[in-house]
């Protein structure tokens, strides 16, 4: 059968010895070995099989196969299509030594011989002999297996004849579908004429079912015959088992009788003693319970007494202890069924009393007269209140204190204003009713004194708030420290109890008829030392009554919960009062840490409140533009006062408040804008009225410049009038250099120093002042350029013309400002934070603009002479007399130019200017000579020109400061090519 080839129920041969050969059954199906295809296939002969084996050029042309001669060395060597074998296939490419070279054996591989297997053969020979002997004794398994396989296949074939519906586990004839499948009534017809056929079909169906039954019975009989030995063995074992059970029941009955006798003789008396001990302990418990009830009954009167003395913490501890006893020890006592709710209401009442008490304390503490030392009011009372509020988790008491702070800050300003106004007789309070209007009637000295008084009161107020909050903060930290220490102590007993529980779990507990465990009786009778250990950890309220003097009932006086949870200890806060920190006060570390941070935040809020009230006070005074009308001295005094208050509050609170600082910055910005506009307007008026003539330099300006040279960038202090007055100088001497300047520049230097001094007095406006100062310097540069170079002064001032002297004077003024720009830059750089140093680039831009302006003025002076040379030399003729009128006129104009600028400009600049003028002169002269065809040939015309040039050179070098000037007049002649 086909199934016999797929699986075999009997193992084929033994696999116990892997070293022995197995006999292979020749009848078994062996898969034929497929030979590799021939390298050189035969020519197709029409056989289909041959065609299938051979490669296909169509299908295999893109797939690599062994038929590719490119990669198949044997195919390349044995190719029959070649005309001849190439014997020198390798040698012709790789040399003659390629074929004859022998492969050297590996040094790491040993030589294996038969001697290496001798030890293995000796070891295995004995086992091989035993195996051969056993194989001869035992019958061959192949025959047995073949027989069983044949029988199995036959029975399986018979069973396959039975329909599958009979083999289903849910086979039931009461199912209509199953019944119709087994008995197909559709084949039977009760109508006449077909009765004989129906009878035959019925008979045939009955025979078929009988045949199926026979097959099943034969298979069942066969299976029973195969397992008959196991059935007989089971029946025999059943009889033996019944005999064993009968003997066992008899032995158990005898054992029970003996145990009953032993129990009666040896155990009943001892158990009776234990029962009596349990009864006695129960009586003691009832007695202690009654005493505890008597103590609890006195709770409410005791709480009333404690509240009358403001002992909130003690009353709360007593209520908490009583609540714990009611929930554990006295649970279910009918007479105390309402006591728990009464204590809860009493606890809520205490909460309200503590909050009201804290509010009263806050009002009393913050509204004390702001004189004297900053001591805490009734420190012990504060500590007691804070502990009570923490115990009840009433953490909003800081909000009450914060609200009281706001009210107090408002009252401080109101009281100070009323006090100040009442001292001034000029203010009629009956006419001016509003307090703000009365305050606005104060002049600046009176108002600044009032502000100073308010700031001093605010400072004392903040110091008192800080002292009070420090006490609260220390209480919170003590509770936090105690909580952490208690948690560490609780972890140690838990670790010990874990070890004890593991040993107690193995003990045997005997249950009596009363439902008690004997182990309970032993635990009740533990030595007194253990009881003392437990009571030593308990701590009741100091106002609770003692339990009893009975030593027997002492361990039962307090509850188990008090011994396990209410471990309290006395802590000493800064107030000196000892407050008990109970387990009930179990705020988490997160809550306590948050509360501590809120306390610090409340102190900062107090500072913010003071700053906010001060800002409102300033704004109410600034409504009529009072602050904007302050001069520099007054505003600096106000700014310093406000900055001092900001620093003082920052030292107290540890954080800088921004509201007053912002108000100061806002007023400072307004002051800076007004300050700058005033000076810009002043500079504009000075420039519009400047006639650009050299001005005398008063002695005070020379002193101002000298102080700048000494490193003091500030306006000099006003000195008393001296009878001896110094005469003004012609020029301004700056570090040994003389500067001829106009009056506007002198005042501009003073204005610049005012900007620098304002930065020193008000550091917060440094950046704004830098921007405004650069704007002022740019304005001076651009406006002076418009007036002088652009000839705007002709219309503004009414000058007839812009002379070379005006130009030189303007250039020298610009040079003076350029000289002081690095000094100003260094002054601002020292006062700017490093991150704002980028703003200093404005000074570099201004310096470049000034240098460009100076260069334009120099170019303008050269252009004036250039136009003169062009006009005069264009009419020049080479003829007598010598020197010619043209050259006389040129020398005259050069002398005037020198006289105009020499006393104004430095000698080096004058020389550079005349070198440029001389270059322009040579260019025009060369052009005219070229036009006249005068060359350097030594002729008469050349002599005349040489004489004129010598006259020009002599006159120019005779001018002051131009003696050593290299004129290089040979350049006027055309170079010969």
UniProtKB/Swiss-Prot annotation:
Q: Which residues carry this modification: Phosphoserine?
A: 8
Per the UniProt entry, the effect of residue 967 to Q is: In wr; destabilizes and consequently reduces protein levels, as well as those of the GARP complex
Per UniProt, the keywords (alphabetical) are: Coiled coil, Disease variant, Golgi apparatus, Membrane, Phosphoprotein, Protein transport, Transport
Gene3D superfamilies hit by this protein? 1.20.1280.130, 6.10.250.860
Residue runs in coiled coils:
239-261
GO BP terms, alphabetized: apoptotic DNA fragmentation; astrocyte differentiation; cellular response to progesterone stimulus; gene expression; homeostasis of number of cells; homeostasis of number of cells within a tissue; in utero embryonic development; intracellular calcium ion homeostasis
Location relative to the cell = Golgi apparatus, trans-Golgi network; Membrane
**One Pfam assignment:** Vps54_N
* Domain of life the protein comes from: Eukaryota
The cellular component terms of Gene Ontology attached to this UniProt record, alphabetical and capped at eight, are:
cytoplasm; cytosol; GARP complex; membrane; mitochondrion; nucleoplasm; perinuclear region of cytoplasm; synapse
List, as start-end ranges, the regions of compositional bias called Polar residues: 532-570
Annotated spans, Disordered: 528-573
List the InterPro entries hit by this protein, alphabetically.
Vps54, Vps54_C, VPS54_N
Disease field reads: Defects in Vps54 are the cause of wobbler phenotype (wr). Wr is autosomal recessive and is a spontaneous mutation discovered almost 50 years ago. It causes spinal muscular atrophy and defective spermiogenesis.
Q: What does this protein do?
A: Acts as a component of the GARP complex that is involved in retrograde transport from early and late endosomes to the trans-Golgi network (TGN). The GARP complex is required for the maintenance of the cycling of mannose 6-phosphate receptors between the TGN and endosomes, this cycling is necessary for proper lysosomal sorting of acid hydrolases such as CTSD. Within the GARP complex, required to tether the complex to the TGN. Not involved in endocytic recycling.
Q: Please state which protein family the record places this protein in.
A: Belongs to the VPS54 family.
What assembly does the database describe for this protein? Answer: Component of the Golgi-associated retrograde protein (GARP) complex, also called VFT (VPS fifty-three) complex, composed of VPS51, VPS52, VPS53 and VPS54. EIPR1 interacts with GARP complex and mediates its recruitment to the trans-Golgi network. Interacts with VPS51 in an EIPR1-independent manner.
Q: What is this protein called?
A: Vacuolar protein sorting-associated protein 54
Native species: Mus musculus (Mouse)
